[in-house]
């Protein structure tokens, strides 16, 4: 009987945690190595479409995310000056009926927490910042900044924009400025006052050379994300 390969995932973000959860569901031998010292509620808003929700159904966190997120009926596009609706994409019940799962917006950190909680605590090693990876043919050796090393048969890189795995495979590549800037923040939803227009659950404001997206990131609609 062949032994199950040792699978290492570098990075316990959304991609790494989801990959680990799916592989563990298949009974595979998986361990995740994360450079952060522990979990924290990082990030801002994120859209989660029906295709992703179907994957989360397999992991077992679909219902929890549905309860946690905001479910906009439409994604509106509005003119920056007049507020006129330029376009609207049906979501809400339309998405469930036509695509078989919800479309929602949520705080990335809350989404991430559900994925981390779906993993056994023993499956994630924190404080493991990868410095080097060696493919020795029969085994892959990972070296970490704390002086330790680990072996695996398969290594999956899920270590984000500054990926050491990608750099080891493809060489270093400096970022290039593309000429665009983005500002983002999460705010408590302000109280509604007389004369204020109601908040759209999900809206994109358009001008000629810039745009701003605004949407709720909780089912309670108590936090708004601007980008």
Residue ranges of model-derived segments:
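Short helix-loop capping/hinge motifs at secondary-structure junctions, enriched
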Residues: 63, 190-197
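N-terminal Rossmann-fold NAD(P) dinucleotide-binding loop
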Residues: 16-17
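A short secondary-structure junction signal
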Residues: 166-168, 194-196, 226
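Glycine-rich FAD pyrophosphate-binding loop
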Residues: 24-44
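Residues at the starts of beta-strands that form the adenosine-phosphate
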Residues: 6, 29, 223-225
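Conserved N-terminal helical subregion
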Residues: 2-7, 12, 49-188
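Active-site substrate-recognition segment that forms the wall
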Residues: 78, 198-227
């Amino acid at each position: 009987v062949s032994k199950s390969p040792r699978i290492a995932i570098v990075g316990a973000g959304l991609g790494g945690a989801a990959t680990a959860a799916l592989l563990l569901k298949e009974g595979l031998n998986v361990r995740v190595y994360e450079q952060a010292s522990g979990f924290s509620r990082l990030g801002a808003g994120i859209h989660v479409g029906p295709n992703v929700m179907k994957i989360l159904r397999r992991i077992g966190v679909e219902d929890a995310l549905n309860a946690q997120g905001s479910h906009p009926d439409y994604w509106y596009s509005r003119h920056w000056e007049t507020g006129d609706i330029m376009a609207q994409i049906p979501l809400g019940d339309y998405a469930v009926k036509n695509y078989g799962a919800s479309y929602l917006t949520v705080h990335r950190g809350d989404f991430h927490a559900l994925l981390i909680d779906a993993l056994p605590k023993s499956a994630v090693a924190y404080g493991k910042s990868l410095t080097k990876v060696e493919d020795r043919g029969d085994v892959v050796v990972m070296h970490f900044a704390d002086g330790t090393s680990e072996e695996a048969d398969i290594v999956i890189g899920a270590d984000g924009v500054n990926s050491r795995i990608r750099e080891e495979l493809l060489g270093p590549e400096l970022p290039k400025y593309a000429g665009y800037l983005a500002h983002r923040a999460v705010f408590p939803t302000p109280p509604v006052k007389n004369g204020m227009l109601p908040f759209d659950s999900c809206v994109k404001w358009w001008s000629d050379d810039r745009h701003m997206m605004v949407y709720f990131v909780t089912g309670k609609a108590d936090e708004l994300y601007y980008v």
